[in-house]
Structures are given as structure tokens and as C-alpha cells.
Amino acid sequence: MKPLNIIFAGTPDFAARHLQALLNSHHNVIGVYTQPDRPAGRGKKLTASPVKELAVANNIPVYQPGSLRKEPAQQELAALNADIMVVVAYGLILPKVVLDTPRLGCINVHGSILPRWRGAAPIQRALWAGDKETGVTVMQMDVGLDTGDMLLKTYLPIEDSDTSASLYEKLAEQGPVALLQALEGLANGTLAAEKQDEALANYAEKLSKEEARLDWNKSAKQLWQEVRAFNPWPVSYFEHQGNTIKVWQTQVSETTSTAAPGTIISASKKGIEVATADGVLTLLSMQLPGKKPLNVADILNARGEWFSPNTRLANEAQ
């Protein structure tokens, strides 16, 4: 297969993994687009994205326009004369004139099995909803949000132990493999594009800190899904004793209870059992303010008096 001249557009670590795969391939990455440097850390020092750092280390020209809607930026991109543009978690909207510029158009690697979970947080929403599988879709981009024709899909079962952090890692390995397969198929003309079924489409909204508050009036199963979805960010939490307590790991208990939602049923080194609207949730790993995440045995050693049976934990709906 003849090497393709590729423009790569992406910003976070997930995107950098895909750029590395392209750099390891026989294709030519002729330019990299990434978001402008942003203030980060306590000192708010301007910091380059992981994609920019990788591109600079490999002596690839880097472009960081604040927008691709203006003609000078569009002309600069067109002058690269790329065969194709690969977009992974870039964060800027590509207008139609940009989508139409490369000979083979623009393709995107998306962390879900489209058309399910279009949008910003597909990995997290799959866990949040209790999906049994997720995966990666490589699609031909159009002007819509993740609405383009699908070129290739890979599938990944979601395990009970998975969190957003672990799924992110698995998909960051699966995505680059799918990307290289899709590029080969496009170059050879062997890929058949498949339209998305709009009836099956839904939207993966961004997560918010407020959404991560545990509402004991939900079911134990839903809360268990949320804790996994919101790990590593924004991390599920509840208010108790005037403190915000983060919850990193839970499981659905086989215990049954008629106690009011938010009531502690039992507290031992095996876990703190809390009644919900449907079932009992066992808290296994938590984080007290200013401390590291700890297993429940250590939490009880430090603050056992906070978690006595029959204590009621704060609840949004109280």
C-alpha cells in the first residue's frame, strides 16, 4: 500500500496514542493540528497538549489555530496538500470547507459503537447506562456531531470491574489498531461506508460535578454504574458530617432492606452498606477531605463514629 500523506488533529493523551501509531506506520504525518497551549497546574503555566509534545519530539510541524472557521487557517491547511486528515479528540469544529479539503476527506476515531453515544463523553456514558459492550468507530466526518458514515467498528465487552479509567486504557489500545485498518481499507478502496441509523442515535453529554452527587433515591445498581462512570473524574460523592466524601468503588449488595434511602445498614471492614430506593449499595473505597482514597477498613479506623448503623447519609432529595 502506498503511504498516505496525513494531517493529524487531536489534543489529549487518547489522541497522542493514535498519533504514535501513525508515526510507527509507513504513512507520512505531514502536519499536526492541536488546541492552543492552555494554563495548567497550580502555577497556571501555559502547557502544550500531549499531541503537541509528541509532534515536536518528532519534528513534525504543529498548527494551533483557535478556530478553523477563518480563511487564512483554511488556506494554511489546504497548502499541506494532504491525502487525508485523521481527527481524534481534537476539540475544534471542522467546517465543511475543511472536511472537503483532503483528497480522502477527514476521518474520526470515536470511543463508542455509533450511532450510540455520539458526543463528548461516550466512554463514561456507556458505563453510566449499564451497557454490556462498547468499542471504537472509525467514521468519515460530515458537518454533524459524530453523524458521519461508519467505516469500521471494533467491539469490547464491558466488565463489572471496569471504570472510565480502565475503559479509556482499553479503547486507547483498540483505537489505533482500528485506525490503521481503516486507512488501509480507504487507500485500497475496500471499505464500504455504512450510514448511521438515526433511530438508534443518542447523545453522550459531558459530565458535571453536580451529577456526581450520589442520590440514594436511585437504585443500588444505577449508583454502582455511576461510581464506575465517574472514576477518575469527577468522582462520585456525598455530603456527611459537613464534609464532602468521595466514593471510588462500590458493589451491589445481596442484603435487602426496608430502611429509608441513605440509611447505613451495617459498617465493617468488608464495606459500609447503604440502603437505596432499590437494593443496598456497599461502599468499598472512599476518600475523606484532604486525604488519599482508602479502603473502608481504614476509613472506619479513622472515622468510625461517622458511619454507625442507622445513621442517615445526606441526600439531594431529603
From Swiss-Prot:
Catalytic reaction annotation: L-methionyl-tRNA(fMet) + (6R)-10-formyltetrahydrofolate = N-formyl-L-methionyl-tRNA(fMet) + (6S)-5,6,7,8-tetrahydrofolate + H(+)
Keyword Transferase: yes
EC number per UniProt: 2.1.2.9
Top-level taxonomic group: Bacteria
Keywords from the UniProt entry: Protein biosynthesis, Transferase
Ligand binding ((6S)-5,6,7,8-tetrahydrofolate): 112-115
GO MF annotations, alphabetized: methionyl-tRNA formyltransferase activity
GO CC annotations, alphabetized: cytosol
Similarity-based family: Belongs to the Fmt family.
Function noted in UniProt: Attaches a formyl group to the free amino group of methionyl-tRNA(fMet). The formyl group appears to play a dual role in the initiator identity of N-formylmethionyl-tRNA by promoting its recognition by IF2 and preventing the misappropriation of this tRNA by the elongation apparatus.
Entry protein name: Methionyl-tRNA formyltransferase
Organism, as annotated: Shewanella baltica (strain OS223)
